[in-house]
Amino acid sequence: MKIHKCSFCGADIPPGYGIMYVRSDGTVQRFCSRKCFVSAVKYGRNPRKLAWVRKKKAKTSK
């Protein structure tokens, strides 16, 4: 099974978990949590400007 990366925060998503979102142009985005999904799709936030994303990326990169 393939482990995917979250399109918003970059966290690993194990098989069977997360949200898969397909845009109208056919682009597939995968999210590890509803928090990432809503931040990206509903609010259109930039992950580089959010402190919790930077902390999560630093934690997963170790």
UniProtKB/Swiss-Prot annotation:
Family: Belongs to the eukaryotic ribosomal protein eL24 family.
Annotated binding of Zn(2+), by residue: 6, 9, 32, 36
GO molecular function: rRNA binding; structural constituent of ribosome; zinc ion binding
Name assigned to this protein: Large ribosomal subunit protein eL24
Xref: Pfam families: Ribosomal_L24e
Species this protein is from: Pyrobaculum calidifontis (strain DSM 21063 / JCM 11548 / VA1)
Keywords: Metal-binding, Ribonucleoprotein, Ribosomal protein, RNA-binding, rRNA-binding, Zinc, Zinc-finger
Co-factor: note: Binds 1 zinc ion per subunit.
SUPFAM superfamilies attached to this UniProt entry: Glucocorticoid receptor-like (DNA-binding domain) (SSF57716)
Signal peptide residues on this chain, from the entry's feature table: none
